[in-house]
Amino acid sequence: MQNFKELGISDNTVQSLESMGFKEPTPIQKDSIPYALQGIDILGQAQTGTGKTGAFGIPLIEKVVGKQGVQSLILAPTRELAMQVAEQLREFSRGQGVQVVTVFGGMPIERQIKALKKGPQIVVGTPGRVIDHLNRRTLKTDGIHTLILDEADEMMNMGFIDDMRFIMDKIPAVQRQTMLFSATMPKAIQALVQQFMKSPKIIKTMNNEMSDPQIEEFYTIVKELEKFDTFTNFLDVHQPELAIVFGRTKRRVDELTSALISKGYKAEGLHGDITQAKRLEVLKKFKNDQINILVATDVAARGLDISGVSHVYNFDIPQDTESYTHRIGRTGRAGKEGIAVTFVNPIEMDYIRQIEDANGRKMSALRPPHRKEVLQAREDDIKEKVENWMSKESESRLKRISTELLNEYNDVDLVAALLQELIEANDEVEVQLTFEKPLSRKGRNGKPSGSRNRNSKRGNPKFDSKSKRSKGYSSKKKSTKKFDRKEKSSGGSRPMKGRTFADHQK
């Protein structure tokens, strides 16, 4: 395996890379860096998490060190990805005087104009805000020699294809080296390559997200009215460390987030209407384990690079294979195992088959957890919490109440009653989600058929998960047991069973 120095990287940059823990280049870095240093156009097909930022960022640092003015422009689909790329570039170039500026919407443009006037060597931005600066002439292109399009297919999916053309057309082709990276190569991206790139070197890497055996993929068949309860039952049984939940619409994300919070789960939501300050706050909470469930739309989650995600739940099935690929690619990274579960209405099974055919592998059918499994998981969780609570000092007033109760009731019955209330507390909470119509069946041409997706004049009614619960699941179970007042010693406490987890593959 070649090291970075053997690829032609300077000692200063190698030192920065080693301080970041990067000793050897990843496959895409090894294949891309030599051509990038020569100024050759590069067309890279790679997923997030393969080291593609280093593939274009490391040679870029080598080309701009010691020079002044904007020399490189990097386009990214989202604000989060733009910030992540910029931060990595700053780390790559530590101590070498390279200035990196980010420009994106949701932040004051005046502050960005001020930063651009200082003549940074590298600008990273989203297409819309970059065009704003081009039109204002606050971003000059005459000195730009390198243009990089990161996650080009995502920018296309978000409707930026014309913006990408506009920006590429503004940078003089004679002096421009173009590097385009994309997980997939749809026709629109291929046309962009043909129009604006000069005999690019094509580099492909192993499709980490689609072929990674570390991701176990499942689907579970569930009707819309039963979906939320089935989902929370999976959460109770799986006990995810960090989970990303995908909803199809902003409304779905808002309602699902509120419903989860009301049930006691640590969740936050992300979608396109969330302010930049709120987005940063939510992501910080997720990365710092203050919350463990992130509910998001496809657009809001694009460009996020969060490690440690153990589970991905497609609460709403994605409408195309590419979205599915990007969704499940948030888990199973860095050699860790991941689980992806897709909830599918019976009439949406054509979409599951389409995804399986495109990816060349089958998903495993996963039955919803039984009530017994859910209760066992909740009991295990409560036992662990109680053990943690016992290590903390209780307030004196609570000790007084405890003494009074223990004097009045049998201790085992008292603890059992309290545990039952804790375990079944979620069943008492009512939540409402707007009914979402399932996707249309696929026709013979692979496109939706019939009129299932036509807008109903009556709108989308709301359903109450308490009254419309899954068959066999009670929404409200109150204990009818009356515990006896204490007359005799209980003879000691009853031993609890050890912690067991239901097998998600049963």
UniProtKB/Swiss-Prot annotation:
ATP binds at A46, Q47, T48, G49, T50, G51, K52, T53. GO terms for molecular function: ATP binding; ATP hydrolysis activity; RNA helicase activity; RNA strand annealing activity. Its main location: cytoplasm. Residues 33-203 form the Helicase ATP-binding domain. Residues 468-480 have a biased composition (Basic residues). GO terms for biological process: response to cold; RNA catabolic process. Belongs to the DEAD box helicase family. CshA subfamily. This is DEAD-box ATP-dependent RNA helicase CshA. It comes from Staphylococcus aureus (strain MRSA252). The gene is cshA.
